[in-house]
Curated annotation (Swiss-Prot):
The keyword Electron transport does not apply. GO terms for cellular component: axonemal B tubule inner sheath; axonemal microtubule; cell body; cilium; cytosol; glial cell projection; manchette; mitochondrion. This is Parkin coregulated gene protein homolog. Pfam families: ParcG. It comes from the Eukaryota. Microtubule inner protein (MIP) part of the dynein-decorated doublet microtubules (DMTs) in cilia axoneme, which is required for motile cilia beating. Suppresses cell death induced by accumulation of unfolded Pael receptor (Pael-R, a substrate of Parkin). Facilitates the formation of inclusions consisting of Pael-R, molecular chaperones, protein degradation molecules and itself when proteasome is inhibited. May play an important role in the formation of Lewy bodies and protection of dopaminergic neurons against Parkinson disease. It comes from Mus musculus (Mouse). Microtubule inner protein component of sperm flagellar doublet microtubules. Forms a large molecular chaperone complex containing heat shock proteins 70 and 90 and chaperonin components. Interacts with STIP1, PRKN, GPR37, HSPA8, TCP1/CCT1, CCT2, CCT3, CCT4, CCT5, CCT6A, CCT7 and CCT8. Interacts with MEIG1. It is found in: Cytoplasm, Cytoskeleton, Cilium axoneme; Cytoplasm, Cytoskeleton, Flagellum axoneme. GO terms for molecular function: actin binding; alpha-tubulin binding; beta-tubulin binding; G protein-coupled receptor binding; Hsp70 protein binding; Hsp90 protein binding; ubiquitin protein ligase binding. The keyword NAD does not apply. Keywords: Cell projection, Cilium, Cytoplasm, Cytoskeleton, Flagellum. One of its GO terms (biological process) is spermatid development.
Length: 241
């Protein structure tokens, strides 16, 4: 009789899966086998930054400005206690530009209205002050607040036409001013209640950026376009085309 073969219990073998190695991109580890590259952090380019207390607000609260609030049939306006042409622009204009970062009434109203009044009456007093205006402009834009960006763009458009050579004087400062414009250039969607009132108020951020860049090119001299293009690669010339 043939001998029966005794079946042994089936042995199980554990298969060890290779552990994934998490690594940063563009490193030696990232090229190793079983390496999983960690994705980039969320950029937050459009994220609004918190505003800091402005020097403009402190000066206003101390009563350092020769201004008062006046009401008429058209609404609020600034009553200047001195002739605007006689103001010390080196002192006052940078302070008012510092107020571009304000969003609270009456500070934001006085800063914005005051800037436009001073640009309207400044003449040749404006050009020498340009270097002092760059940091307040940059600070306002860097808050990434849509309303503040729109207000600052309108101020920049007024600034370049306020006096001769101002547009050209801004050219060395494109690196400070234009990066935020490059980020928001294609943002043309109203983020409010679904009804787009923005074009009526000229609050359409993408259009305002386009208008501002065109103003920079028109008044910035022959090197303006190439310098704008360097900072905002999608910009196309309004003069060459």
């Amino acid at each position: 009789m043939p001998k029966r073969t005794k079946l042994l219990p089936q042995q199980t073998f554990q298969v060890h899966q290779p552990r994934s190695l998490v690594s940063e991109g563009f490193t030696v580890k990232a090229m190793m086998k079983n390496s999983v590259v960690r994705g980039p952090p969320v950029a937050g380019a459009f994220k609004e930054r918190p505003a800091k207390p402005t020097t403009f607000r402190k000066c206003y609260e101390r009563g350092d400005f020769p201004i008062a609030l006046e009401h008429d049939s058209k609404g609020n306006k600034i009553a200047w206690k001195v002739e605007i042409e006689k103001l010390d622009y080196h002192h006052y204009l940078p302070l008012f530009f510092d107020g571009l970062s304000e969003m609270t009434f009456p500070y934001e109203f006085f800063a914005r209205r005051g800037i436009h009044d001073m640009l309207e009456h400044g003449g040749n007093k404006i050009l020498p002050v340009i270097p002092q205006l760059i940091i307040p402009i940059k600070n306002a834009l860097n808050l990434r607040n849509r309303q503040i960006i729109c207000v600052t763009l309108k101020v920049l458009q007024h600034l370049v036409v306020s006096s001769e050579m101002v547009g050209e004087a801004l050219l060395p400062y494109y690196r400070q001013i234009l990066p935020i414009l490059n980020i928001f250039k294609n943002m043309n969607v109203n983020s409010g209640d679904g009804i787009d009132y923005s074009q009526q108020k000229r609050e359409n951020i993408g259009d305002l950026i386009q208008e501002t860049l065109e103003a920079f090119e028109r008044y910035g001299g022959e090197d303006a376009f190439i310098n704008i293009k360097y900072m905002v690669p999608t910009y196309e010339s309004c003069l060459l085309n």
